[in-house]
Design a protein with these regions (language model features):
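Active-site-proximal segments of metal-dependent phosphoesterases and phosphodiesterases across multiple
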Residues: 65-139
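Extended active-site neighborhood of metal-dependent phosphoesterases/phosphodiesterases
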Residues: 1-67, 95-97, 184-186
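Catalytic metal-binding/acid-base residues of hydrolase active sites
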Residues: 30, 77-78, 145-151, 168-170
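Active-site-proximal beta-strand elements of phosphoester/diester hydrolases
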Residues: 21-31, 73, 162-168
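Binuclear metal-dependent phosphoesterase catalytic core
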Residues: 10-18, 116-117, 122-138, 150-229
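Intrinsically disordered, highly charged
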Residues: 254-257
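Hydrophobic alpha-helical topogenic segments used for membrane insertion/localization
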Residues: 227-252
Length: 257
């Protein structure tokens, strides 16, 4: 159909009866926003949401009036993913991540330590187009899976819907040291599903494209080390400047005597 994006579609999964028992939604979350001063990344547009709601209503009607249980996959995560987190306390800053876009002034940690690995602030759009609320309205989406943020594999429920990140699985884009992974999603005929993460190292594989240090530290540790080095550098420069200023001031006083 003539709607925003190139890959908005769904795939019904039939059970033993030959009738659809489950559904998989695939949405095109596009690329950059038309005005990057407002938002770096694009949104799911209103015409895409309308298409989803119309198709969901059609599937509901064909399913005797009950929502057809579904999972949804798209690249850019929804802004509601930040509801899996809370603002970091001062003593938690060492493990916190900086928010993205209009949330950049805040630092976050996961609310639940069992929600996976958070290594960077989710790079969601700064504009909330109402996609998540649309899922709640239609009642069919049980879980949504995202890419985009290469180092995160967090997963947790927001208002009864699982929001899960899929970490990068390769080494050619920025990644998390030797820890790329895949997320396995298993759907059962009763409409339930489960998901798990399996990393490159779980399979006892050795990456030949990473150096010995890169294999042993995560990107997050590398970022922390860079921040620490920068902080030490700034501290040293500040101390040197202050010391130099102090000496200059003393010299000036001596000359005045």
């Amino acid at each position: 159909k003539n709607i925003t994006g190139y890959s908005n579609y769904y795939i019904p999964i039939c059970g033993k009866s030959g009738k659809p028992e489950f559904n998989l939604w695939f949405m095109d979350s596009n690329n950059t926003f038309y005005d990057t001063d407002i938002s770096a990344y694009d949104i799911i547009h209103r015409d895409q949401i309308d298409w989803y709601e119309q198709a969901s209503a059609k599937l509901r009607k064909e399913n005797k009036g009950a929502p057809l249980p579904a999972l949804l996959f798209q690249h850019i995560p929804v802004l509601e993913e930040y509801e899996l987190m809370r603002k970091a306390k001062p003593w938690e800053m060492w493990k916190a991540v900086r928010g993205f876009g209009h949330l950049r002034k805040n630092w976050y940690v996961l609310k639940d330590k069992d929600n996976g690995y958070l290594a960077e602030g989710p790079c969601s759009p700064d504009v909330n187009s109402g996609q998540f609320e649309s899922w709640k309205k239609m009642g069919d989406v049980k879980g949504a899976f995202f890419g985009h943020d290469h180092m995160n594999n967090i997963a947790g429920e927001v208002d009864g819907i699982l929001l899960a990140q899929c970490k990068t699985s390769g080494f050619w884009a920025y990644t998390d040291g030797g820890r790329p992974s895949v997320r396995l999603v298993t759907v059962h005929e009763d409409g339930s599903f489960e998901t798990s993460v399996h990393s490159f190292k779980d399979f006892a594989l050795d990456c030949t494209c990473l150096g010995p240090i890169e294999k042993r530290i995560t990107d997050r540790q590398s970022v922390n080390a860079t921040i620490a080095a920068y902080a030490l550098g700034v501290g040293a420069i500040t101390a040197a400047v202050m010391l130099g200023a102090g000496k200059a001031c003393q010299s000036f006083k001596n000359r005045r005597k």
